């Protein structure tokens, strides 16, 4: 009973924080609101450790039925909390990163008048993510799924007076609604064919669903898994549905850290892992997931190379790392995917919040306009360096263990996406060093007064990052130990399912495969330092007056026109033209169609329908009003005229007949 109450508290404390700060927004004291938000989230994080020790390490499963929700005939759905090893590790990632972001926000948003509203939205965001990962059925999961989508809209567009923030929020909302349409179709299909939305009932029907062929060689399970994965692609920003993610940087930096590290974007990876029982019986969709993940990790990393906005580089890095996670799930290494999800939560939050400290100090996001900040902000420099090395996968940091686990699984599965993963690892190291060299080394490009006043942020912003540094160091070692348990899937043995135990295949990979990820990371580091150590390194602008004294002049236009390297750089700089393609193929046709409907609705239907009728009535009433002159002789004329017309009518009638 005690553990059940703790589970309820973990989820309800963020909700209570959001409700209290949201309802009493205008009357509550600012300091009290901050204490409530950070205190409640910190308690939730501490409670999650207790549940991790009980459920995760001891192998217990907690299932709490809170109250009935839907009951139609034999179809029943309850509000429930389901805690197993997978949920408990997600609780750790979500609550700890969220509580750190809440504390960091006290300093970052200190001068913002809407800080209480901001904390309310952050807490609500956390609640929906916790509800998502603790559900025991697809409908409750969809409730949390849509909840994090709505909260992301509110937080990305938090500065609603800023037009670009509003556009980014709408863009994120619409793209996620498009993918969520596929997701809800998948849930409906599950309910139709299984008669239930509960995980236990649906997952036990996986083999049966795989034998129901609907056309060609596709089973109904293939369709279900495809629809669910399309939903995951939108939420986790995979290639094709990724375009909202960099625009989400318009929100405050703590929002970026929360969205990209522990909530929302990780929901898709969690869903695939939770539904491993379904996906294992759909090998075709698993291959599709592997390809999408592998292509995304290389695709996003290549874009990050060419960006100059510090937050957008890290955003594309998130997109790339999510690709790694999906690639792991695609080769049935769900445990490796979740392992990387958790380690990534710590070092990516560290990177975002360190970037926030830089932005807070110099009020600039273009890395080519910074430089030489390592002496001004040594703690931030150290934090960013640790986060970057963890991202690259350097031993003994967390990324080394989790990324290595994914690439080993990809290699052992025989997937050619292993090559994509290795290539992405090199690019990851290059763009990580690009930020470090241009922001913290070299000659500063900042204005003199800005550079002189640059300093470390307040302790309320710096101190919480110590926990993220600890997580970036030790989460990998702990995770490696948990996965090494003498059971299939290690720590996740009761949560994940493998139709073919891939673990036997990778128990003894070649030594060079184990060392290759870190080796290519080191190559990328050296390359990044070489390319960006010069203060005259180019920023790839659209036009440049001269290429003289520029080390990387090979990328400029040749005397014969555009070189292949310039063409590639333009493609990368313009993000493979996805926005332009969508604008041409989707946005403009929809706008044209909307204009056509507007013409038909406003200019034809309304003009000759309700509006036209009202104009006729108005004209008639005006004419009628003019008859009422108030003069007796006018009324006498009307009477005489009426009598004359009446008599004339009857006389004419008699003459005719």
Curated annotation (Swiss-Prot):
Its EC number is 7.1.1.-. It is found in: Cell membrane. GO terms for molecular function: NADH dehydrogenase (ubiquinone) activity; quinone binding. It is a multi-pass membrane protein. The keyword Membrane applies. It catalyses: a quinone + NADH + 5 H(+)(in) = a quinol + NAD(+) + 4 H(+)(out). Belongs to the complex I subunit 5 family. NCBIfam families: NDH_I_L, PRK06590.1. This is NADH-quinone oxidoreductase subunit L. It comes from Rickettsia conorii (strain ATCC VR-613 / Malish 7). The gene is nuoL.
